[in-house]
């Protein structure tokens, strides 16, 4: 792969992140609604939140993926976090998700001391499930009819990694 860099998401990245989430396959894997505007993405990413760490994956300076790690801020759950990830359709299966996951887990383990990370993933997203399992995530349960996507309800697994 060419030069792949994971770094903090900056305001100049917002348009490119919008393009990531505008990719049909990337969008289908999220709980977002298609056709979100660049302004909506900009507002979401620019909202400063305690415990939120937005990252981007760049290949030769071009944003091709995005991950946001968020710490649960309740005093009783601050040992836990969750994340969402998306990779542009034309970069899926090329190591971008793996690199984002490695950066996420480094941040969670070595800087934030999180002992639990969890996520939701649609049950039909086999490549994502395989990626998460590769990093030690296990399925803890399934939310039935979790989201409405493309005219039908879909289930989602809750996956978590404990350390």
Regions found by a protein language model. Name each.
Residues 19-33:
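Helix-loop element at the rim of GNAT/NAT acetyltransferase active sites that forms part
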Residues 8-11, 30-90, 101-103, 107, ...:
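Acetyl-CoA-dependent GNAT
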Residues 152-163:
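Terminal substrate-recognition subdomain of acyl/acetyltransferases
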Residues 118-121, 133, 138-154:
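Conserved catalytic-core motifs of GNAT/GCN5-like acyltransferases
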Residues 109-120:
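Conserved GNAT acetyl-CoA-binding A-motif
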């Amino acid at each position: 792969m060419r030069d792949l860099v994971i770094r903090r998401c900056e305001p100049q990245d917002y348009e490119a992140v919008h393009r990531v989430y505008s990719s049909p396959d990337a969008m289908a894997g999220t709980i977002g609604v298609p056709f979100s505007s660049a302004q909506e993405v900009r507002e979401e990413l620019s909202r400063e939140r305690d415990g939120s760490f937005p990252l981007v994956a760049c290949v030769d300076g071009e944003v091709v993926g995005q991950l946001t790690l968020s710490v649960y801020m309740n005093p009783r759950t601050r040992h836990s976090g969750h994340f969402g990830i998306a990779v542009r359709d034309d970069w899926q299966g090329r190591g971008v998700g793996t690199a984002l996951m490695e950066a996420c887990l480094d941040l969670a383990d070595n800087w934030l001391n999180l002992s639990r990370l969890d996520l939701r993933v649609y049950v039909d997203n086999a490549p994502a499930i395989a990626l998460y399992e590769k990093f030690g995530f296990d399925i803890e349960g399934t939310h039935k009819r979790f989201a409405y996507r493309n005219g039908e309800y879909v289930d989602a697994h809750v996956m978590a990694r404990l350390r």
